[in-house]
Protein backbone atom coordinates (compact mmCIF):
# COMPACT_ATOMS: atom_id res chain seq x y z
CA UNK A 1 0.00 0.00 0.00
CA UNK A 2 1.26 3.45 -0.88
CA UNK A 3 -0.16 6.51 0.87
CA UNK A 4 0.43 9.72 -1.04
CA UNK A 5 -0.56 13.26 -0.13
CA UNK A 6 -1.79 15.81 -2.66
CA UNK A 7 -2.92 19.44 -2.45
CA UNK A 8 -6.39 19.74 -0.88
CA UNK A 9 -7.94 20.36 -4.30
CA UNK A 10 -7.01 16.82 -5.33
CA UNK A 11 -8.57 15.03 -2.33
CA UNK A 12 -5.90 13.84 0.05
CA UNK A 13 -4.83 11.32 1.14
CA UNK A 14 -4.92 8.81 -1.69
CA UNK A 15 -4.31 5.21 -0.67
CA UNK A 16 -2.97 3.10 -3.55
CA UNK A 17 -3.74 -0.63 -3.55
CA UNK A 18 -3.01 -3.30 -6.18
CA UNK A 19 -6.31 -2.93 -8.12
CA UNK A 20 -7.92 -0.01 -6.32
CA UNK A 21 -7.31 3.34 -4.74
CA UNK A 22 -9.10 5.00 -1.84
CA UNK A 23 -9.60 8.72 -1.46
CA UNK A 24 -11.98 11.06 0.33
CA UNK A 25 -15.14 11.86 -1.62
CA UNK A 26 -15.38 15.23 -3.38
CA UNK A 27 -18.26 17.20 -4.92
CA UNK A 28 -17.41 15.98 -8.40
CA UNK A 29 -18.16 12.38 -7.37
CA UNK A 30 -21.88 13.05 -6.81
CA UNK A 31 -23.26 11.86 -10.16
CA UNK A 32 -21.29 8.60 -10.24
CA UNK A 33 -22.03 7.99 -6.54
CA UNK A 34 -25.78 8.62 -6.98
CA UNK A 35 -25.95 6.35 -10.04
CA UNK A 36 -24.07 3.52 -8.33
CA UNK A 37 -26.14 3.81 -5.15
CA UNK A 38 -29.37 3.85 -7.21
CA UNK A 39 -28.56 0.65 -9.13
CA UNK A 40 -27.40 -0.98 -5.88
CA UNK A 41 -30.29 0.10 -3.65
CA UNK A 42 -32.00 -3.30 -3.35
CA UNK A 43 -28.64 -5.02 -2.97
CA UNK A 44 -27.62 -2.72 -0.08
CA UNK A 45 -31.03 -2.54 1.65
CA UNK A 46 -30.55 -5.53 4.00
CA UNK A 47 -27.49 -3.90 5.60
CA UNK A 48 -28.26 -0.19 5.59
CA UNK A 49 -30.77 1.99 7.41
CA UNK A 50 -33.78 3.19 5.43
CA UNK A 51 -32.81 5.90 2.98
CA UNK A 52 -34.60 9.26 3.22
CA UNK A 53 -36.55 10.27 0.11
CA UNK A 54 -33.83 12.75 -0.91
CA UNK A 55 -30.90 10.38 -0.21
CA UNK A 56 -29.44 10.57 -3.71
CA UNK A 57 -29.94 14.27 -4.39
CA UNK A 58 -27.07 16.68 -4.87
CA UNK A 59 -28.05 18.63 -1.74
CA UNK A 60 -28.10 15.46 0.40
CA UNK A 61 -24.70 14.53 -1.01
CA UNK A 62 -23.33 17.97 -0.11
CA UNK A 63 -24.62 17.55 3.45
CA UNK A 64 -22.90 14.17 3.56
CA UNK A 65 -19.62 15.75 2.40
CA UNK A 66 -19.91 18.46 5.05
CA UNK A 67 -20.39 15.81 7.75
CA UNK A 68 -17.41 13.82 6.42
CA UNK A 69 -15.27 16.96 6.42
CA UNK A 70 -16.25 17.86 9.97
CA UNK A 71 -15.58 14.31 11.18
CA UNK A 72 -12.15 14.35 9.49
CA UNK A 73 -11.24 17.74 10.98
CA UNK A 74 -12.24 16.62 14.48
CA UNK A 75 -10.55 13.22 14.17
CA UNK A 76 -13.93 11.53 14.64
CA UNK A 77 -14.14 9.69 11.31
CA UNK A 78 -12.55 9.18 7.92
CA UNK A 79 -14.62 8.45 4.80
CA UNK A 80 -13.07 7.13 1.60
CA UNK A 81 -14.52 6.20 -1.76
CA UNK A 82 -13.12 3.13 -3.47
CA UNK A 83 -12.10 3.43 -7.13
CA UNK A 84 -10.91 0.78 -9.57
CA UNK A 85 -7.49 1.79 -10.86
CA UNK A 86 -7.90 0.47 -14.40
CA UNK A 87 -10.72 2.91 -15.25
CA UNK A 88 -11.27 5.12 -12.18
CA UNK A 89 -14.75 3.62 -11.69
CA UNK A 90 -16.31 4.23 -8.29
CA UNK A 91 -16.99 0.80 -6.77
CA UNK A 92 -17.97 1.58 -3.16
CA UNK A 93 -16.92 3.25 0.04
CA UNK A 94 -15.42 2.68 3.47
CA UNK A 95 -15.68 4.72 6.64
CA UNK A 96 -13.55 4.62 9.75
CA UNK A 97 -16.06 6.05 12.24
CA UNK A 98 -16.50 6.65 15.95
CA UNK A 99 -12.78 7.19 16.43
CA UNK A 100 -11.88 7.03 20.10
CA UNK A 101 -8.49 8.16 21.30
CA UNK A 102 -7.00 7.88 24.76
CA UNK A 103 -6.47 4.36 26.05
CA UNK A 104 -8.87 2.74 23.56
CA UNK A 105 -7.35 4.04 20.28
CA UNK A 106 -10.14 2.38 18.30
CA UNK A 107 -12.76 2.94 15.60
CA UNK A 108 -15.68 1.28 13.86
CA UNK A 109 -15.31 0.21 10.24
CA UNK A 110 -18.21 0.52 7.80
CA UNK A 111 -18.30 -0.33 4.13
CA UNK A 112 -20.53 -0.70 1.09
CA UNK A 113 -19.93 -1.94 -2.43
CA UNK A 114 -22.01 -1.37 -5.53
CA UNK A 115 -23.85 -4.41 -6.84
CA UNK A 116 -21.98 -4.45 -10.20
CA UNK A 117 -18.66 -4.78 -8.35
CA UNK A 118 -19.53 -7.37 -5.73
CA UNK A 119 -17.87 -10.78 -5.56
CA UNK A 120 -14.62 -9.61 -7.18
CA UNK A 121 -12.52 -9.33 -4.02
CA UNK A 122 -12.57 -5.53 -4.21
CA UNK A 123 -13.94 -5.07 -0.71
CA UNK A 124 -11.39 -7.47 0.77
CA UNK A 125 -8.65 -5.34 -0.79
CA UNK A 126 -10.26 -2.07 0.33
CA UNK A 127 -10.76 -3.28 3.91
CA UNK A 128 -7.10 -4.28 4.04
CA UNK A 129 -6.12 -0.79 2.83
CA UNK A 130 -8.46 0.89 5.30
CA UNK A 131 -7.14 -1.16 8.20
CA UNK A 132 -3.55 -0.41 7.21
CA UNK A 133 -4.45 3.30 7.21
CA UNK A 134 -6.10 2.92 10.64
CA UNK A 135 -3.10 1.22 12.20
CA UNK A 136 -0.18 2.87 10.39
CA UNK A 137 -1.46 6.43 9.78
CA UNK A 138 -4.04 6.93 12.54
CA UNK A 139 -2.04 4.88 15.07
CA UNK A 140 -5.11 3.01 16.26
CA UNK A 141 -4.84 -0.22 18.24
CA UNK A 142 -8.22 -1.77 17.39
CA UNK A 143 -10.68 -1.63 14.51
Predicted regions and their residues:
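GNAT-family acyltransferases
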Residues: 1-116
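Residue-level recognition of short, well-ordered coil/turn positions
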Residues: 76-77, 122, 139
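Conserved acetyl-CoA-binding loop-helix of GNAT-fold acetyltransferases
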Residues: 112, 119-133
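Conserved GNAT acetyl-CoA-binding A-motif
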Residues: 136-143
Amino acid sequence: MVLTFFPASKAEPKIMLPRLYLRPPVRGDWKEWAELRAVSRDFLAPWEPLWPDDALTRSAYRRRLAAYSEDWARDHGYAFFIFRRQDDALVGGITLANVRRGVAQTCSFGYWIGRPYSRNGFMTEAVHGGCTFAFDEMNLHRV
